Amino acid sequence: MEFRKWISISLGAALLMSILNGCGASQTTPNHDSAADKGGIRSAAPASPSGSNAASLRTPAALDLTGATIITLSGSTVSIEGSGAEAEGGVVTITEGGIYAVSGTLDNGRIIVNAGSADVTVALSGASIVCSYGSPLYIYQAGTATVHLMEGTENTLTDGESYTFSDSLSSAADEEPNACLYSKADLVIEGAGALAVEANYNNGITSKDSLEIYDSAVTVDAANHGVNGKDSNTIDSAILTVTCGGDAVRSTNDSDETLGWVSVLNSTLTLTAGEDGIQAETSAVVSAGTYAITSGGGSTATPGDDVSAKGIKAGTDLTLSSGVYTLDCSDDAIHANGNVTITGGSYTISTGDDAAHADGDLTVSGGTLDIQDSYEGLEGGTVTVSGGDITVVSSDDGLNAAGGNDGSGFGGHGMGNAFTPGGNSSAITITGGTIQVLAGGDGLDSNGSIEMTGGTVVVCSTGGGDGALDYESSFTLDGGILFAASAGNMAANPSSLNQPALSVGFGQTLEAETYVQFKGDAYDFVFRLTGQASSAVFSAPELEGGAVCTVSYGGTYSGESARGLCSGGSYSGGTLLAELTLETGLTSYGQTGGMGGRGDMIGRGDRPEGPSGNGMTPGGDFSTGGAGGGEPGEAGASGGGNPPSGGPGGQSPSGGTPPEGDTPCESGTEQGS
């Protein structure tokens, strides 16, 4: 057994190095704390699961039953042909290595494997075993125990609601066994047959060493946890359906950082869990399959404070790649105490907390993420998007770089931003991809900086006390298309521009589904608002200083408006807001004064750090204009000032004037620049 375990760990490390160089798990039992419950960012384990887009870990082979011991079950009796096994009182005990073919029905008995260090294969061929007092299939001692499901057969294991720990092979103190299929040795489930596990007492399938499921169709209905491999849990080319009160798929070894990992590859998983869907004490990799996970009753349920009900969870790093994922979770849908890496796949997510959360770095380089409902969309110490197609609907922030542990960790449900202070190391970096955000809070929110050098970002923030853009230190815009619309009075502009940008106030609140057009000689950008907006920031590489841009709203559009950016059609019937001569940096028009977010605020400048101010809490003297400031009516390409009364700023000299009859505000003095 030790030699096999060494091989398994070495193979995991080798596969990780060979695969993850090209591309990268944890919940406690109700009565035990795992190391990951202690929170904080954890480093990745040296040995980890195999990774994304990998071929199957092995080639399945048909089992040759020549020379096998034949065990035939018939009600309360058992017949045995061959050596290595004996039966007494409905209990079959296997004491030698070899292959044992099992068929028939056992009304109230069990199979026990007690073969020392020898490898044992139990081939189930239409077997149904019911045991009212313990595990129907109990691997007490073996080198490696293999349960082979013969092709085309259906097999069932069913236990009772209570166990009797009265023999020398069981332990009431250690609660062993505590699963319908329980192994104290490395356990492999394989074969082209089917296995149904009805676990009425506690857990469905448990291995205290490694668990590997290949090629099989396995269904588990468990009172507590579903499928547990303590040292590691590998599922490859399998169909697994789990309904359970605890975690559906898990690995829990917290004493060895090379163990406790989960690898799921080329499989179809349907998991309905009262707690976590997939949880790994260290790292997890999920790839190339179809994964439907409902945890904690789904996104509309409220889990208890001490219950973790996440979709996919890792204690160190979590890597997700190709595959189709449907996640409906009351807690975080995707969570790691270390880093989360998403390189591909299609995701449909509804969650009562974060769609994807990393205490460390959250990186998206590909895939399609449709986050239909969340508290926060993407949250991490840093958030980096270099590719992919992302849609976020959130009641709070869309993308949030906060830094540290947000308090949700491996324990219970954690709403809100309870990160430990991240400072300027927190960052949102966007170099590619397409992002659309409809946020009840801030659209893009960083406790440190925001940097955008490419991609397309369309944001609508509908919260009255929030804005589309919110940052602590800086927002550098050096490429890409940005449209950030805000309904409230906390709108902010980029602080550093390497391409022209427009900051406009509409003079009214535009409703969702309203079109906004920015048109110049060389471009015609049309956006569809996904929420209410009273102001917006727009920038694109096509904008040029000194050129004229017309801004219109309303009207109709004949083409597609995927992700808020319209294409393939024509805009007509809009109301002209203004014709603006662009500055080389920021051109502001029609802004009204008021509270801004962190950073370079529309209509007022930076929030000062006063007696109670830290850039987050109001404090100090709000009469100072700060960046983009100026007294009312003062010329300035950066836009309006912050008058002592907190009222409107002045008009930008380059802003022009709106056409007659289309004045956005009631009077010119209300048109802050």
Where does each model-flagged region fall?
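A composition-driven surface/loop motif
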Residues: K5-G12, L16-S673
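N-terminal secretory signal peptides that target proteins for export/translocation
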Residues: M1-F3
